[in-house]
From Swiss-Prot:
PROSITE patterns with a match to the protein in the record: CARRIER, PHOSPHOPANTETHEINE
Subcellular localization, as worded in the UniProt entry: Mitochondrion
UniProt PTM comment: 4'-phosphopantetheine is transferred from CoA to a specific serine of apo-ACP by acpS. This modification is essential for activity because fatty acids are bound in thioester linkage to the sulfhydryl of the prosthetic group.
Subunit comment: Complex I is composed of about 45 different subunits.
Annotated organism of origin: Dictyostelium discoideum (Social amoeba)
Protein name: Acyl carrier protein, mitochondrial
Positions of the Carrier domain: 43-117
Residue positions where O-(pantetheine 4'-phosphoryl)serine is found in the record: S77
Function in brief: Carrier of the growing fatty acid chain in fatty acid biosynthesis. May be involved in the synthesis of very-long-chain fatty acids. Accessory and non-catalytic subunit of the mitochondrial membrane respiratory chain NADH dehydrogenase (Complex I), which functions in the transfer of electrons from NADH to the respiratory chain.
GO cellular component: mitochondrion
GO terms of molecular function: acyl binding; acyl carrier activity
Stored Pfam families: PP-binding
Name of the gene this protein is made from: ndufab1
Length: 120
C-alpha cells in the first residue's frame, strides 16, 4: 500500500516538471545569443586600421591613407611595433613576430587582416 502510494505521488510530482519544461516548450535561440561569424568587410578593416594609425601620438595631424607607409609618417620600427600591438587589440588577434616584421604600411596591415579569419 505504501509502495503504491509513493509511486502515485512521485509520478504526479515529476510529471509536470518533465512534461511542461522539457517536452512541450520549443527551443528557440534569440538573435542576441547567436554569434555572427561572417568576415569583416574590407572597408571596415581599412577604416579601423586608419583609425588606429591616426590615433597614434606621433601621427597626429598627418594624413593617413590606405597606401601610407609607416616610414612616410616618420615612424621607426618601435613605433611600427606599437601600432601593430594596437591593431592586435583592435581586432582581437595576435600577429606572429615573423609576420609583423614584414608589415611596413597600412596596406600591408589591411592585407594581413583580410587573410586572417579570426579578426573581429
Amino acid at each position: 500500500m505504501i509502495r503504491n502510494t509513493f509511486k502515485l505521488v512521485s509520478n504526479i510530482a515529476v510529471r509536470p516538471a518533465f512534461s511542461s519544461t522539457f517536452v512541450r516548450q520549443p527551443i528557440v535561440a534569440s538573435s542576441m545569443m547567436v554569434r555572427n561569424y561572417g568576415s569583416i568587410s574590407e572597408k571596415e578593416i581599412t577604416d579601423r586600421v586608419i583609425g588606429v594609425v591616426s590615433q597614434y601620438d606621433k601621427v597626429s595631424g598627418k594624413t593617413v591613407t590606405p597606401t601610407t607607409t609607416f616610414k612616410e609618417l616618420g615612424l621607426d620600427s618601435l613605433d611600427s611595433a606599437d601600432i601593430l600591438v594596437a591593431v592586435e587589440e583592435e581586432f582581437g588577434i595576435e600577429i606572429p613576430d615573423e609576420e609583423a616584421d614584414k608589415i611596413t604600411s597600412c596596406a600591408e596591415t589591411i592585407s594581413y587582416l583580410r587573410k586572417t579569419p579570426t579578426a573581429k
